[in-house]
Amino acid sequence: MKTLQMTLSNKKNNFIPYIMAGDHEKGLEGLKETIQLLEQAGSSAIEIGVPFSDPVADGPVIEQAGLRALARNVSLSSILETLKTIDTKVPLVIMTYFNPVYQFGIEKFVAALEKTPVKGLIIPDLPKEHEDYIKPFINDKDICLVPLVSLTTPLSRQKELVADAEGFIYAVAINGVTGKENAYSNQLDQHLKALSSLTDVPVLTGFGISTLSDVDRFNKVSSGVIVGSKIVRDLHEGKENEVIKFIENAINF
């Protein structure tokens, strides 16, 4: 079992915060201190976004964070170079669209990841049918390709998506982009229970989670939560203490 999956399997109430690399007053120089802050607060893993000019899955908060990072000339290459200098006990997960990886060179990208604490990859615009672009390069590495499973995904498709999944399953709690709050389906809890029954891989719930009541709800029917827009917004507004309290409360339900 790879590190990311082992880490999440050994815990309940997993909490994975999402941050945008380079969305800091110090640019990428601030990435290390943000990771340290999130690690010390009790995060199970940390998802790091790569800014992209056409972020189809991102809501306005994360899209704006990406634009701020791009304005600081943050790129996949500069992020990887920065991550090589960071030492953390918490597994990192890179969230990137496929085009930057393809332009960088897939084999070169994976080789660079191996020199960092990155243990997982989320590529939202890479469908299952095209995973062979990535999988052959990471199968024997301590890096997992994390699948996203939507509430509207048919059961037969869910089984395909989780069949050879590693790390964790990213269960998409709402239909649409990230940060769209209070739009949860009444069937969501049952969907998450059903999804969890298909696999031994931890299922974590994300998209739109912004309150401790959301966290409590999803901790009861999945292995934990991923919180993006709230974390990105609070960090941008200088509310580090609020972020720490939120994570501490979330993991201690």
Curated annotation (Swiss-Prot):
Protein's pathway: Amino-acid biosynthesis; L-tryptophan biosynthesis; L-tryptophan from chorismate: step 5/5
Disulfide bonds: none
One Gene Ontology MF term: tryptophan synthase activity
Residues spanning the membrane: none
Catalytic machinery residues: E47, D58
GO cellular component terms attached to this protein's record: cytosol
A Pfam family this chain is assigned to: Trp_syntA
InterPro entries on file: Aldolase_TIM, RibuloseP-bd_barrel, Trp_synthase_alpha_AS, Trp_synthase_suA
Keywords for this protein: Amino-acid biosynthesis, Aromatic amino acid biosynthesis, Lyase, Tryptophan biosynthesis
Protein family (similarity comment): Belongs to the TrpA family.
Purpose of the protein: The alpha subunit is responsible for the aldol cleavage of indoleglycerol phosphate to indole and glyceraldehyde 3-phosphate.
Assembly behavior: Tetramer of two alpha and two beta chains.
Alphabetized PANTHER family for the sequence: TRYPTOPHAN SYNTHASE ALPHA CHAIN, CHLOROPLASTIC (PTHR43406:SF1), TRYPTOPHAN SYNTHASE, ALPHA CHAIN (PTHR43406)
Protein's name according to its UniProt entry: Tryptophan synthase alpha chain
Organism from which the protein derives: Lactococcus lactis subsp. lactis (strain IL1403) (Streptococcus lactis)
Organism classification: Bacteria, Bacillati, Bacillota, Bacilli, Lactobacillales
Gene: trpA
